[in-house]
Amino acid sequence: MRKYEIMCLMSPELSEEEFKTLYESIHQDIQSLGGEVQNVDVWGKRTLAYPVKKFTEGYYVVMNFLFPQNQLPEFERRLKLREKLLRYMITLLEKEE
C-alpha cells in the first residue's frame, strides 16, 4: 500500500453536522476500499484566495491514509459523486514499501 494525502474543499453552505457527516463518509470510503486512515486534520471554514464554483469560503479537511493503488480510480469516482465536495487533491506521499 502507498501513503497518500487528500485535501478536500467542501461547500460553505453545509451545517457543522453535514460537514462532519461528509468527511466521515470519505473516511468510510477509504476504509471500505481497503485503506487505512492514519490522520485527520479538520481545518474548518476558511476564506478562499479566489472563488471556487462561485464560493469565497469553504470547509477544509486533510487526511493522510494508506491505500491500495489499484483502488484509487474507484475512490476518485466516489468523490466525484458528492455534490457538496467542491474540490479535492490527492497527493502521493511515499512510494510502496
Swiss-Prot record:
Which organism is the protein's source? Answer: Dictyoglomus thermophilum (strain ATCC 35947 / DSM 3960 / H-6-12)
The record's annotation in HAMAP family points to: Ribosomal_bS6 (MF_00360)
Family, similarity comment: Belongs to the bacterial ribosomal protein bS6 family.
Annotated GO MF terms:
small ribosomal subunit rRNA binding; structural constituent of ribosome
Provide GO CC annotations from the record. cytoplasm; ribonucleoprotein complex; ribosome
Function of the molecule: Binds together with bS18 to 16S ribosomal RNA.
What lineage does UniProt assign to this protein's organism? Bacteria, Pseudomonadati, Dictyoglomota, Dictyoglomia, Dictyoglomales
Protein name as annotated:
Small ribosomal subunit protein bS6
Q: Which UniProt keywords apply?
A: Ribonucleoprotein, Ribosomal protein, RNA-binding, rRNA-binding
Pfam families noted in UniProt: Ribosomal_S6
GO BP, sorted A to Z: translation
Q: What domain of life does the UniProt record list for this protein's source?
A: Bacteria
